[in-house]
Every structure is written in C-alpha cells, then in structure tokens.
C-alpha cells in the first residue's frame, strides 16, 4: 500500500490596485508585487504544473500550502480560482492551508473573497480547521495559522486549540503516521529580527511533536526557496518553495514506512536542483 501526494505553494497571484489599498497593509503588498515580484513570479507555471499533475503525476491527493494571492483583493482570488479550476474540477482531493497573504487584511470584502475561494478550492474535501483527512496509510492534520498582522510582520499564529488538536491526534493509538499540513514552518529558524518577522508564533508545542517524531512529517510553504530537513525515512519538515518563483513541485510517496521526495519542474520532469 502506498500514498502519493504532490505539494505546491506560494503561487502569489499578482496584486491588483484598489483605492482602499491606500489605507491598509495592501499598499505594501501592491508595491512588493508590482516592483519586486512581477517579473519573476510566473503565473504560466501554474498552468504547466496542473497539466503535469493531471496528465502524468496523477497523485492520490494534492497539498496547496497557501499564499494563493498577494494582497487578498477579491479580484486576485478570482484569478487564482480561474487558474486552479482544472485541478478543482478533476476531483483530486485538495488539502489547503491558508497563507499570510490569503488573510492579509481585516477588510470585509477580502475576508468574504477568501471564504469563497476556500469553499470552491476544497469543494471535494470540505473541513473546518484544524481538521483531519485520512487515507488507508496516512493521517493529514490540516491547520490554519494565518492572521492579519501589521505591515512589518509576515507572521502566523498557532492558537492553543490548534496545538491541542495536534497533540490529541499525535497521542492516538493509530499506526498511520501523522502528517501536518500548514503554511508556516513549525521549526524555528534562528533568533534574528528577520526570522521573527516570518515566524509562527505559539508553535512550541507543535515543534516539540515534530522533533519527537510524533508528527512524522510537516509539509509547509511560506519560504519561497524549497528545502527539507528529513531523516533517513523521510520524516521531518519539508518546505515546498514557491511554484511560480522557483518552478518546483514536490512529489512525495509514502510506502513501507518511508516518505520519498522527488523535486520536479512544472513540466513534471526531474528538477535539476534535486
């Protein structure tokens, strides 16, 4: 018995201008998207990735580790849904954990657009967060740690209830490994100001579960360069990297107690960085 899943993250649909963006954090996201990211985050890679997933990879499920958009403007969510529509319509289960850009601001229109996006994206796998998705040989704990923060922070925050959920699932007498699906890495990355700005607050209990092996694998996004800290059985934490920036899909196969990772380009071919 085996389970194969494909992971992608941080597609960052390009920001669009809104007059309301002048009065909240969206203006910073708009500037970043327009002047720093526009030429290097290539949206056509989403189309190529979906073709590869549907035509050749054919996984049992897909994990999207968040950041569909740049400033959470409703038009960005509409564009992202249009690009992702063939994957949604395929019926392949999609597990989605929101990113900080998906919950960028408190504006009502943006929050409502996010909820519509979430409902359509996960139409075949609806769940409340935190939630559990099960296959015959794996358990996937899907969490939501995205919150609007001030303009200088790109943090997430894990609630005590989410940590309780992970501890309860990890404590179950179940032989199937537990995979945590989130946007923000559980493992801390130093004590610098830059590390804090992108950190996951309140994650110490979850990080301990990962370090103790009670969470077998943490699958996340947020950091745009793909990486992983895995042991000989493929257990640990995998950072997907940005699909549109780095042209990478992560294919993970679980078989005989081992997670095997392949890095692929958006054409489905082996990634030269692997």
PLM region descriptions:
Residues 12-16, 70-75, 96-108, 148-152, ...:
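Active-site environment of divalent metal-dependent phosphoester hydrolases
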Residues 2-15, 32, 137-148, 179-181, ...:
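Active-site-proximal beta-strand elements of phosphoester/diester hydrolases
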Residues 1-77:
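N-terminal active-site segment of His-dependent metallophosphoesterases
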Residues 35-37, 68-72, 146-160, 190-194:
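Surface-exposed cleft-lining segments at the edges of enzyme active sites
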Residues 1, 256-274:
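A short C-terminal boundary segment appended to hydrolase-like catalytic domains
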Residues 1, 50-61, 139-141, 153-236:
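His/acidic metal-ligating clusters that form di-metal
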């Amino acid at each position: 018995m085996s389970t194969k899943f494909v992971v992608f993250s941080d597609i960052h649909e390009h920001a669009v201008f809104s007059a309301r963006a002048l009065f909240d954090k969206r203006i910073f996201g708009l500037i970043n998207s327009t002047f720093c990211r526009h030429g290097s985050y290539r949206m056509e890679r989403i189309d190529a990735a979906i073709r590869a997933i549907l035509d050749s990879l054919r996984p049992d499920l897909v994990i999207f580790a968040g950041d569909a958009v740049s400033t959470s403007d409703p038009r960005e969510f509409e564009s992202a849904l249009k690009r992702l529509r063939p994957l949604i319509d395929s019926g392949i289960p999609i597990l989605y954990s929101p990113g900080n850009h998906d919950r960028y601001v408190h504006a009502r229109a943006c929050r409502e657009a996010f909820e519509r996006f979430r409902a359509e994206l996960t139409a075949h796998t609806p769940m409340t967060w935190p939630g559990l998705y099960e296959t015959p040989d794996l358990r996937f704990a899907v969490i939501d740690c995205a919150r609007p923060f001030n303009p200088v922070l790109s943090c997430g925050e894990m609630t005590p209830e989410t940590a309780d959920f992970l501890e309860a699932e990890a404590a179950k007498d179940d032989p199937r490994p537990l995979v945590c699906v989130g946007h923000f890495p559980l493992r801390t990355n130093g004590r610098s100001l830059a590390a804090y700005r992108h950190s996951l607050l309140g994650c110490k209990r979850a990080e301990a579960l990962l370090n103790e092996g009670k969470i077998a694998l943490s699958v996340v996004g947020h950091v745009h360069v793909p990486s992983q800290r895995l042991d000989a059985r493929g257990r640990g934490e995998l950072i997907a990297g940005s699909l549109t920036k780095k042209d990478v899909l992560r294919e993970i196969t679980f078989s005989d107690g081992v997670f095997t990772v392949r890095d692929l380009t958006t054409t489905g071919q082996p990634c030269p960085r692997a």
